[in-house]
UniProtKB/Swiss-Prot annotation:
GO biological process: ATP synthesis coupled electron transport; photosynthesis, light reaction
Catalyzed reaction equations: a plastoquinone + NADH + (n+1) H(+)(in) = a plastoquinol + NAD(+) + n H(+)(out); a plastoquinone + NADPH + (n+1) H(+)(in) = a plastoquinol + NADP(+) + n H(+)(out)
Ranges annotated as spanning the membrane: 1-21, 31-51, 60-80
Primary gene name: ndhE
A GO MF term: oxidoreductase activity, acting on NAD(P)H, quinone or similar compound as acceptor
Listed name of the protein: NAD(P)H-quinone oxidoreductase subunit 4L, chloroplastic
Amino acid sequence: MLEHVLVLSAYLFSVGLYGLITSRNMVRALICLELIFNAVNINFVTFSDFFDSRHLKGSIFAIFVIAIAAAEAAIGLAILSAIYRNRKSIHINQSNLLTK
């Protein structure tokens, strides 16, 4: 069972990393970053259950990561909305805010 969950987590992490590297759209990049966070959370919960199922340290840490990821997504979407209002584009290569 452990191997299946780790393969799933590695697949999610790989898809998220590939999407983050190749994405030109900021929304897609944020979604891929969330995929990476979810893969890490799966690992936390899996290893916590595998090594010591009596303690919920991995699950508690995963809840903290989910809360931080939600805050990151909210701040990221707010920044993205401000960039779209100013630049009328959400492409990563067109979002150089140092030039006018």
